């Protein structure tokens, strides 16, 4: 009888052990499946985070590219304006330099061609009698056009009245309210003892005072 009870006790203990072992295995399986699900969820969550990060980075890159393009576009028009504005300036400076060089050359030519004022050979005192000048002749001449130029202009003006072949006779200087002026006399070959009187101011403007003057 004791043997039977002992065998029954051992059998029941074995059954209990098997039962516990089965429960442990099923519990371990449940834990494993839960862990796998957590790992999957975590990996999915991480992948979503990575995707969001990539999207954010792409947006930032696009924004930076757009900003750089805008800055480049904003700078280029300014460069164009500067280049455009520089060209006319260079041209105007070049033209100005050319004009200055021409003016200087003209002044040098006039100085090289300078001829001191003179009376014609065997001149009659006509202009000198009309306008005797007792002032500083050199100072007056500095304010007047070149003598040869003034004489040529005055002669052309005199030839517009009467004979066109008048000859130079004499000159004088006359003081005016605004400075000085030349006084020229030109002999008319077609009339006896007749002269044309022409004045020329500082600006080089001639005026026929008397086309038929007889001293």
Swiss-Prot record:
The keyword Signal applies. PROSITE patterns: PROKAR_LIPOPROTEIN (PS51257). Residues 1-17 form the signal peptide. Keywords: Cell membrane, Lipoprotein, Membrane, Palmitate, Signal. GO terms for cellular component: plasma membrane. It is a lipid-anchor. It is found in: Cell membrane. This is Uncharacterized lipoprotein SERP1959. It comes from Staphylococcus epidermidis (strain ATCC 35984 / DSM 28319 / BCRC 17069 / CCUG 31568 / BM 3577 / RP62A).
């Amino acid at each position: 009888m004791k043997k039977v009870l002992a065998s029954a006790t051992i059998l029941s203990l074995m059954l209990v052990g098997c039962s516990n072992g089965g429960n442990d295995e099923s519990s371990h399986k449940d834990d494993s499946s839960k862990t796998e699900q957590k790992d999957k969820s975590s990996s999915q969550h991480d992948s979503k985070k990575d995707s969001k990060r990539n999207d954010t980075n792409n947006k930032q890159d696009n924004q930076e590219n757009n900003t750089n393009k805008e800055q480049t576009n904003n700078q280029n028009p300014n460069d164009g304006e500067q280049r455009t504005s520089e060209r006319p300036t260079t041209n105007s400076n070049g033209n100005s330099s050319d004009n200055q060089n021409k003016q200087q050359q003209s002044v040098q030519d006039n100085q090289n061609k300078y001829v001191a004022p003179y009376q014609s050979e065997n001149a009659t005192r006509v202009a000198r009698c009309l306008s005797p000048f007792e002032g500083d002749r050199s100072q007056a001449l500095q304010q007047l056009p070149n003598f040869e130029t003034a004489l040529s202009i005055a002669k052309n003006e005199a030839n517009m009245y009467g004979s066109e072949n008048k000859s130079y006779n004499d000159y004088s200087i006359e003081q005016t309210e605004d400075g000085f002026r030349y006084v020229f006399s030109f002999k008319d070959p077609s009339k006896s003892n007749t002269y044309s009187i022409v004045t020329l101011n500082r600006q080089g403007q001639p005026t026929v005072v008397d086309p038929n003057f007889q001293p």
